Amino acid sequence: MNSISALFSAGGFQWILLSLSLAFIVVYSLFYLAVGLYNLYFHPLARYPGPLLGRASSLWYARSLARGTVAQDTLKLHEKYGDVVRIAPDELSFIQPENWSAIYGHQLGKDYRELIKDPRYHDTVKPTPTILTGDWDEHTFYRKILSNSFSEKSLKDQEHILHHFVDLFVQRLKETSAEGTRELNMTDQWNYLTFDVIGFLTYGEEFHCLTSSKLHDWIEAMLCVAILMSLGQAARHLPFPFDKIYKQWAIPSNVKRQVALHRDLTEVAIPHIPIQYASAYRLNSRKGDIPYSVLKEHANILTIGGSETTATLLAGATFHLGKNPPVLQKLATEIRTTFVNDGEITVARLSECKYLLATVEECLRIYPPSPANHTRMVPKEGIVLNDQHIPGGIGVGMPMYAAFRASSNFTYPDRFAPERWLGDPMYSKDKKGALQPFSFGPRNCLGRHLAYQEIKLALAKLVYHFDLELNPKCGDWDEQKNFTFWVKPPLWVNLHPVKS
């Protein structure tokens, strides 16, 4: 009896806890060591190359996501290991152009219509079915509703809205640039424009970012939602219990606050969504009015997709044009000789400007607004990619940044050269089909035509009215972290108004 009492005395109890803890650590370590060895030598993907840590565990991918360098890191892996890389035990990364169709296209003649999205991506956001997160039927249903707003007729009817905001953008630049003597942060300026445009198109009211020269609170909050999604993905690649610990303690508190703010701002804005959007839903829905949660999530999707990605591309275009004066001069000459005055610049006539179109394509290639992987899951029966059978349950994807910047796809991939899209023989071996900046297949970006119109119009009017000069301190501006979207620093530019 005394020995039992001694065992459970303070010192004895601590010894038991220590022993159990050590035993747990040993068993835990041995378990994951065994898993790692299995992944390296016996897993169905064991033959695929990749970093040792990435082949053995998900830690490489989790670390890369958490650091915000997954786009650049994946490119480095492809340059080292080739066109197919194993970036996690159960995930393969591809960069060959033909795999856009194989992974993201319609799966004709199969028992399934598409490769579904990796649930680890959407587990970090609310499970409300939307055009992004819904299954095939849900996606098709919502896409049909929204497609009317992005039809050729609707875009033509809305062109005057683009002109209104782009003209206001040019006016504000003239007022604030002080004849080119004052530096402007074009990262913010482009966000002012694109957020005002999408705010009006989505909610039927202006957010007055251009007139106030102030970013709406929603912008920062919206970007924090994107950061949360990336960090949530990182957590899901960690083993238990570190996934729970990471989500609880490693995600910055300011990110959580901004996500809450984003939710509150959405609640305020929802009542102002144009009635034609809700009416379209009622017309097509068999269940009556659109659920509030679905309406709210689609408002978020339209706002994020229609503002941040377009602003990112325009900022990237400004940077690369500033870094490459000969390209800027060619573009300015084309625009200024094609149009006698500003009033002649229309979306239809901009299709005549071949160098402008090539410049936009090259910007999308060298600085894609959505740089990272969009993983799909292989169905249980498996698929064939690169003449190799990929078993069910494996994640596969085409990371845009890696595919667009790979030396196996593009000649001098780090060179900003619109000429590669104009038949220059120097770039004749480019695999131009690798460039799919709006994704591919039935889930490609619904707003891509609107984005092209806004980008072409804004860029054309910028170079028509201004000579731009990039501040040398922004020479490495494009070396950015990415958490779903790029985290863009200030882009300081002097704008010199062109004399009439």
UniProtKB/Swiss-Prot annotation:
Heme binds at C445. One of its GO terms (biological process) is biosynthetic process. One of its GO terms (cellular component) is membrane. The chain crosses the membrane at residues 15-35. CDD domains: CYP60B-like. InterPro entries: Cyt_P450 (IPR001128), Cyt_P450_CS (IPR017972), Cyt_P450_E_grp-I (IPR002401), Cyt_P450_sf (IPR036396), Cytochrome_P450_monoxygenase (IPR050121). Its cofactor is heme. Its EC number is 1.-.-.-. The keyword Secreted does not apply. One of its GO terms (molecular function) is iron ion binding. It holds the Pfam family p450. Glycans are attached at N99, N185, N373, N409, N482. Disruption phenotype: Abolishes the production of heptelidic acid. Its main location: membrane. Cytochrome P450 monooxygenase; part of the gene cluster that mediates the biosynthesis of heptelidic acid (HA), a sesquiterpene lactone that acts as an inhibitor of glyceraldehyde-3-phosphatedehydrogenase (GAPDH) and a growth inhibitor of the salt-tolerant lactic acid bacteria in soy sauce brewing. Belongs to the cytochrome P450 family. This is Cytochrome P450 monooxygenase hepD. It comes from Aspergillus oryzae (strain ATCC 42149 / RIB 40). The lineage of its organism: Eukaryota, Fungi, Dikarya, Ascomycota, Pezizomycotina. The gene is hepD.
